[in-house]
Amino acid sequence: MTEDPSASTGRQFHELSRVPVDPDAGVVYEFGWQSWSPSTAYPVSAGGGFRPTRPELQTSYYRREKPAPAAAFQGEGLLAIEPAPGEPVHVVALRDGRAEVPTIRAERRSDTLHVAADGAVDQVVDDGPGGLYGALARFADRYIAAVGTPTLRDVPPMWASWYQYFTGFTEDDLIRNLDAMDALDLPVGIVRLDDAFQAGIGDWLAPSEGFSSLDGMIGRVLDRGRRAGIWTAPLLVGAESRTFAEHPDWLVRDAAGRPIVAQHNWNQDCYVLDATHPAAADYLREVFTTYRRYGATYFMVDFMYAGAIEGVRHADVDGITAYRDALRLIRSCIGDDALLQACGAPMFPSVGLVDTMRVGTDVAPHWFPPGGEMSSPATRAAVVSTVGRAFTQGRFWINDPDCLVARPQIEGRERWAEVVDRYGGVRISSDGLDQLDDWGLETTHRLLVPARTAPFDPSRVPLDTSLFQDTPPTVEHSAGAPR
């Protein structure tokens, strides 16, 4: 058993440089730890970026071990400074996120930013075209040249159950939407069966009351000539699950021996599965080989940040190693020909191991995040990080901006559709298809195309700051009633 690294005070920061800036016009870009961590550029005058609005969110949405100071900028593995418009961009970045992801900070003192890191990083002054986002794209090119260029697979357009039905999704809902796909001639290549089919968080091979059987559920999709995809949160174990009751030894623990809570969700505490435990690893193998045997060829693994939380594991490994080993285990079960999508996942440690990656928060029927928490589900929050991480598209993986939601009840649906179109890679519809009006159906038809694989070019698709505006969009009611 390894000692709990999270109990330590962490590595010391060392100063790298001092960058003169225009306090009124300079900007600093922060790259967040995982999918839902805010990633965008801020005015130097802000003094720092978005931070957790409640302490427990440090674990579930940010980086548990590395809380950011209120009066400094902080990037996980990547931070960039544009001292003034048109000036060369200072890109401070890690060397290899497969082993460690240093934290980088920039503290403003008058008209200078003091830059420091707690690990090995390089600082490049980029005077190329495209400003800040051009410099970030060139960093991403250098990074994959050093660690290996991922293979980008073809990803067809999809439909997912989540944003219409959430945990209330049933087999009847599935059948109704499969019928609608045929009737509306929607080019859905993969149907993703999202959170709702399973008996519990951690009980992945037992169906919920809404489904007769898991193999039958997947079979219904295959019988329509479409591919089946399935959602799991494989590194979470819910306190109410049978897995938790029967296998408490499968959990990652703190130095005092208490199981680490990764998140409170589904009305229960959710703990971290220790995938280095031989029996827990065997369980993961059983889950994913079973789904593959049933016919699933697309796998969305969610809440994956849990697997990289530092703690006491069966094997003497750090969190990043444990996380990457868990992804490799899953890949070995589903095969190289299957599609693997990560969400809520550590960014740099995932490069080269996943096909598609969520790059922002969840969208939602509402525009503004509750309580101003920019890592929580809200469409404005999703816009900010989807645009802020657009440079990773076609370089680290294929970007998932999150699903297109186009029914009339969605605040800002037209603005969100524009973001998906301009900055996204993967295309996924997630409305009840009988809830779409004329605008929603036309938009869904137009945007449901195969995923882009080309690298995002910030010179061709410049940042549109109007997408961030703080005036709440109206709920549009286009001509035509829901079908």
Locate each region found by the language model:
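Aromatic-lined carbohydrate-binding/catalytic grooves of carbohydrate-active enzymes
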Residues: 155-159, 164-289, 298-301, 306-315
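Carbohydrate-binding surfaces of carbohydrate-active enzymes
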Residues: 174, 180, 184-185, 207, ...
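Glycan-recognition surfaces
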Residues: 244-278, 282, 325-436
